[in-house]
């Protein structure tokens, strides 16, 4: 590690910071590819950021006044209006749950992404040397397990609302008779539609993971090339640019969720 007294090489430093605190690393499961190899740090920081989101909005909701709002209330109201406008413009069905879901996704993903702005060794170094925690990754959205879990949650909602709105027969008809409405084309239609359907959660989760993982690697490379007390010099320019990236990625995840759920509510005959 780049901190004083640490013997890790640059490659060792990078590998160390790309390793999750998992049950396998703690010797609690026998294989790193085991289904039960839970990434403890990713789960902790995803719950942590989720609680921050709930705490902020609960505080604002409890203290909302009809008079002059405070700065925090103004910020929250701007976010709520921003999300509500996007839902109104994009979602063409009727479902009162879509706007709260979109708001939760945007804020939660944004807060998880913001963890990428925490200096590389700010939490892992004291965790290792003071608490004995050997590995610690603080960016949940740079863990493919987290992003794909969220994407699969969206996928489950897509299937649920497709069947609820269109009926099981209508959903099957949509898969079998689109884009070519002819019985002989059913196998071809099914191939296209099933691949397209499965590609939605895959692209949704992997897009967020890929962008955030790449950003994390850049921060780690900047830190690996400099001593610990100069790491901020290499990371600051990228951090300023990365503020835009983390916001855009949260927005894209939210918008694609709205679009996919809007498609699930559409009548296939129109």
From Swiss-Prot:
Cysteine pairs bridged by disulfides in the record: none
Pfam families membership: ATP-synt_A
Organism (species): Vibrio alginolyticus
Chief subcellular location: membrane
GO molecular function: proton-transporting ATP synthase activity, rotational mechanism
Protein name (Swiss-Prot/TrEMBL): ATP synthase subunit a
NCBIfam families named in the record: ATP_synt_6_or_A, PRK05815.1-1
Compartments it resides in: Cell inner membrane
Ion transport is among the record's keywords: yes
């Amino acid at each position: 590690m780049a901190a004083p007294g640490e013997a890790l090489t640059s490659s060792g430093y990078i590998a160390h910071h790309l390793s999750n605190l998992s049950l396998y690393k703690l010797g609690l499961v026998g294989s790193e590819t085991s289904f039960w190899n839970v990434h403890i740090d990713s789960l902790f920081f995803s719950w942590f950021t989720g609680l921050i989101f709930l705490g902020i909005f609960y505080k604002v909701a409890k203290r909302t006044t009809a008079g002059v709002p405070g700065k925090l209330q103004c910020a929250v109201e701007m976010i709520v209006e921003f999300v509500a406008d996007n839902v109104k413009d994009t979602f063409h069905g009727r479902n009162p749950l879509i706007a709260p879901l979109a708001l939760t996704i945007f804020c939660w993903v944004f807060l998880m992404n913001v963890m990428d702005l925490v200096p590389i060794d700010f939490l892992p170094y004291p965790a290792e040397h003071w608490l004995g925690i050997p590995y610690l990754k603080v960016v949940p959205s740079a863990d493919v397990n987290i992003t794909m879990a969220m994407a699969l949650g969206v996928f489950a909602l897509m299937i649920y609302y497709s069947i609820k709105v269109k009926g099981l027969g209508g959903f099957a008809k949509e898969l079998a008779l689109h884009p070519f409405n002819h019985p002989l084309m059913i196998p071809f239609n099914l191939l296209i539609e099933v691949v397209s359907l499965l590609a939605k959660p895959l692209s949704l989760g992997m897009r967020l993971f890929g962008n955030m993982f790449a950003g994390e690697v850049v921060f780690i490379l900047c830190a690996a090339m400099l001593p610990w007390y100069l790491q901020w010099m290499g990371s600051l320019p990228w951090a300023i640019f990365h503020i835009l990236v983390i916001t855009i990625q949260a927005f894209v995840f939210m918008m694609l969720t709205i679009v996919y759920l809007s498609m699930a509510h559409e009548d296939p005959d129109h």
